[in-house]
Curated annotation (Swiss-Prot):
SMART domains: WD40 (SM00320). The gene is eipr1. This is EARP-interacting protein homolog. Keywords: Golgi apparatus, Repeat, WD repeat. The lineage of its organism: Eukaryota, Metazoa, Chordata, Craniata, Vertebrata. One of its GO terms (biological process) is endocytic recycling. Residues 311-339 are annotated as: Disordered. It comes from the Eukaryota.
Length: 387
């Protein structure tokens, strides 16, 4: 059973920002943001044609500055938020804004291969998330499962919740919390939990991971020294409400039960350099992607701590079949965790990995040299999970 070859797309600029187009569940579409100091930065809207194994793209100009992070609205596929650098009074500031893809490109019309970025259209600015009073933005993330009207941003040591009003053309700061402690504490990343009616978020600062209840804007747990060095990324298990994955500069990926934070449930040590990105599969949470500056992407099968640790358990209607074939009885032993694959198509640091929002068996990875690689879960494993 031969697996499909990876599909590679090259951007002309360096890049580290990648997201799936969350609200798009039919087309396989990713958004990539560039980092260039000399030229106008761009958002590449990447459509993957699964049947023909080819990539189509649109290029949109992002005049505001080099893009450090990008997040797609969960409700409107044409709306996105970016964190970007700009120079103001000879100082570099990291800001955030909400943008709309121009109407002409919303229907999935694509450039011909001869088109260049010189005639590319620009993103339409909807509103700024003005954090001037709070410092530099570290990240921005949308409320999951929401109507696209709520955003979380982290700026220096502030956790900020924004409401978008008037068709997303106005942002209002609805609540905030402050990270307090010794020294200059700064948030590095954050994630909004899809569980508990979206009332909890997790943040990382230095080596610690903290949980917050956004109703009271108070801290509800703190994992001190979660990693030996800086925590780079977080992700919530979509199917197990207390489970959280983290990765960091200690080259490790850790899995936590936030009800018992004294030690991780599981630790992976497969990367040889900083781990920048960790992502659970949205449908099959045993599938976990990680990307690292060792230039590798690793796909792990963390089935023992997944929502289906025994695989598919037997339904009552299957019992009669099993009596005829007792040797086919499904095992009740927990399945073993394993590394499914190590993907080495990149030659530079892999800063982002993302699952497709339309196809649960397809994922993309982005390295700093502007190389986007699209891969698939091996067919044998796919059928093993499904059957």
């Amino acid at each position: 059973m031969e697996d499909d070859a990876p599909v590679i797309y090259g951007l002309e600029f360096q890049a580290r920002a990648l997201t799936a187009q969350t609200a798009e569940t039919d087309a396989i579409r990713f958004l990539v943001g560039t980092q260039s100091l000399r030229y106008d930065n761009q958002i590449h809207v990447i459509d993957f044609d699964d049947e023909n194994n080819i990539i189509n793209k649109n290029v949109l100009l992002h005049h505001a500055g080099e893009i450090w992070q990008i997040g797609a609205s969960p409700a409107d596929r044409n709306v996105l938020a970016t964190c970007y650098n700009k120079i103001s009074d000879s100082k570099v500031m990291t800001c955030a804004a909400v943008w709309r893809i121009p109407k002409e490109l919303q229907g999935g019309n694509h450039e011909s291969p001869d088109d260049t970025s010189s005639n590319a259209q620009s993103l339409e600015l909807l509103c700024h998330l003005d954090s001037t009073a709070h410092g530099n933005m570290a990240c921005v993330t949308w409320e999951p499962l929401g109507d696209g009207k709520k955003l979380l941003s982290l700026a220096d040591n502030y956790l900020l919740i924004w409401d978008l009003q008037e068709s997303s053309t106005k942002s209002v700061l609805s609540s905030s919390a402050t990270l307090e402690g010794k020294g200059q504490l700064r948030f590095t990343s954050g994630k909004w939990s899809p569980h508990h009616n979206c009332t909890q978020v997790a943040t990382a600062n230095d080596t610690a991971i903290r949980g917050w209840d956004i109703r009271s804007m108070r801290q509800i747990y703190c994992i001190e020294n979660a990693h030996g060095q800086l925590v780079r990324d977080l992700d919530f298990n979509p199917n197990k409400q207390y489970y959280l994955a983290s990765c960091g500069d200690d080259c490790k990926v850790k899995f936590w039960d936030t009800r018992n934070i004294h030690e991780p449930v599981k630790t992976l040590e497969e990367h040889s350099h900083w781990v920048w990105s960790v992502r659970y599969n949205h449908s099959h949470d045993q599938l976990v992607l990680t990307g690292s500056s060792d230039s590798r992407v690793i796909l792990s099968n963390m089935v023992s701590i997944s929502s289906e640790p025994f695989g598919h358990l037997v339904d009552d209607e299957d019992l009669s079949d099993q009596e005829d074939n007792p040797q086919e009885e499904k095992t009740k032993e927990p399945l073993q965790d394993s590394i499914i694959g190590t993907y080495e198509e990149h030659e530079d640091s892999v800063y982002a990995v993302e699952w497709s929002s339309a196809d649960p068996w397809l994922f993309a990875s982005l390295s700093y040299d502007g190389r986007l690689v699209i891969n698939r879960v091996p067919r044998a494993l796919k059928y093993n999970i499904l059957l």
